[in-house]
Amino acid sequence: MIKTDALIIGAGPTGLFTAHQLKLIGLNCEVVDNLDKIGGQCIELYPDKPIYDIPAIPECTGEELTNNLINQLKPFDIKFHLSERVDEVKKDGDKWIVKTNKGTSFITPNVIIAGGVGSFEP
């Protein structure tokens, strides 16, 4: 079982930004995503489409946004569990036990769901 300060479900922009912020305050985290690569919808569906709603960035593409977020994470040791889907989330006292379809188990006090509106499966 993997023990971590936080488990982020979703490796799209919100999940990546959340991982960055957690590491900045000294918390360890792991990220699980059903897709086989980092970036979520931005990289999977519209890597070349302009995005206009990121604060302080007037315009960027999905690929640029993803690459910038990945570059910001490089100084940190973040483990990504790609091509893995969360199958079970269960409360155990003050912790959560999270299990994936590949049999990976996590124990954490914090589960952050960053699946976004573009999640491909319920």
Model feature map: region roles:
Residues 10-14:
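Glycine-rich Rossmann-fold phosphate-binding loop(s) that bind the pyrophosphate
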Residues 15-16, 38-41:
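Short N-terminal binding/cap micro-motifs at the start of the first secondary-structure element
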Residues 1-9, 24-25, 37, 80-122:
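FAD-binding core/adjacent interface of flavoenzyme oxidoreductases
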Residues 19, 23:
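Gly/Ala-rich phosphate-binding loop of Rossmann-like dinucleotide-binding domains
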Residues 43-105:
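N-terminal Rossmann-like dinucleotide/flavin-binding domain of flavoprotein oxidoreductases
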Residues 34, 45-48, 116:
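Generic beta-structure capping elements
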Residues 42-43, 122:
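Conserved catalytic-core motifs of eukaryotic protein kinase domains, centered on the activation segment
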Residues 27-34, 42:
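Short beta-strand "acidic-cap" motif of Rossmann-like dinucleotide-binding folds
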